[in-house]
Swiss-Prot record:
Keywords: Amino-acid transport, Cell membrane, Disulfide bond, Glycoprotein, Lysosome, Membrane, Symport, Transmembrane, Transmembrane helix, Transport. One of its GO terms (biological process) is proline transport. Residues 72-77, 162-189, 236-256, 310-341, 393-396, 460-475 are extracellular. It is found in: Cell membrane; Apical cell membrane; Lysosome membrane. It comes from Mus musculus (Mouse). Glycans are attached at residues 173, 182, 469. This is Proton-coupled amino acid transporter 1. One of its GO terms (cellular component) is endoplasmic reticulum. One of its GO terms (molecular function) is L-proline transmembrane transporter activity. It holds the Pfam family Aa_trans.
Amino acid sequence: MSTQRLRNEDYHDYSSTDVSPEESPSEGLGSFSPGSYQRLGENSSMTWFQTLIHLLKGNIGTGLLGLPLAVKNAGLLLGPLSLLVIGIVAVHCMGILVKCAHHLCRRLNKPFLDYGDTVMYGLECSPSTWVRNHSHWGRRIVDFFLIVTQLGFCCVYFVFLADNFKQVIEAANGTTTNCNNNVTVIPTPTMDSRLYMLSFLPFLVLLSFIRNLRVLSIFSLLANISMFVSLIMIYQFIVQRIPDPSHLPLVAPWKTYPLFFGTAIFAFEGIGVVLPLENKMKDSQKFPLILYLGMAIITVLYISLGSLGYLQFGANIKGSITLNLPNCWLYQSVKLLYSIGIFFTYALQFYVAAEIIIPAIVSRVPEHFELMVDLCVRTAMVCVTCVLAILIPRLDLVISLVGSVSSSALALIIPPLLEVVTYYGEGISPLTVTKDALISILGFVGFVVGTYESLCELIQPSHSDSSTNSTSAFI
């Protein structure tokens, strides 16, 4: 792998919610050059169906499993409606990013711009001299939030793995073949969930040492298969014998709504996968249709799982719906199967942050120390995600915090501002400016309030939510 310093012309965009190595260069960032991007129809093209599948892959992750709790935090009526609104706004922001990237590509005569490049060159269109002179900070800001997002995903994976394995092991003696009823189980106490996280640490460190995306693509395939099968089994259970929902609140207390926002925007933060997929699509003129179709499917999936999961388990819903599944071998296997998928996905999410941070560090050391420094930095980064997960061992709070801090910036705040600065000098209607300002304000309010409420809940958990929101609690 090349260890040269990251440069604008070398940087390849891996800013997807779930990285898809199949369509990425095997040598990572160092081997990328603008000429390696071929407009669809040349070398590396994808059909509309392949693009749709990759779009679905890039938006479905652990955030999906936390949506039933998110609906609880918003209410049975307000939750699904809010998911629909956030989904529409998120898709609109994806469209803004694609439009601005196309405009700047034509203006600068470049074959492709990733998210960071688009923001950087967009700032160069600003009427402010100071902003133009500091446009390189646009890329740095995108990279910063991308790193926070991807390492935040890794923290979520640590908590998810620990909670699910802990539950399966503690309930092993009481596991039956009867999956008809979701009965209460008295678990056999084992070690603390934080010790489970430490148990996974050495294996995830070794997994992070894989630096070739072609090798990681094998793990990506295994992860996709295991998670797909698990989702089918989860849906199969939650649609059966739904209890009377009359006791569930249509609108939850306002104090928990920011937690809903963080989780929802965490789930919808797949904006980084949009530009690479559009660039590789054979008939790129059809990409907007594929984008809207794919995100419509994802929005329906999110709303249905969130609503049905909350209807099925009510106030007892956990930070991940897998923790509410019955204590029978079939659904215990589902927990393990999904956990296996998450385990392998860790390396793919970690790769994104590693390929931004490591080249800049390794380029400063002598060549014969490059490999050692590379591996040491990878080890340190994995350890950091483990420590953060140990410090915040509640899955719902980790998801909400990551969503509020970084996902809101990438998905809601930056794209509307980018549209304003990109088209400001060419004439932009006041209505568009107003619309973009409202979206950015929505994202910023969610950023501030969601982060504040997540931290408050972390420091001083509310009595009503401390047991139901914690993934450490048992069914």
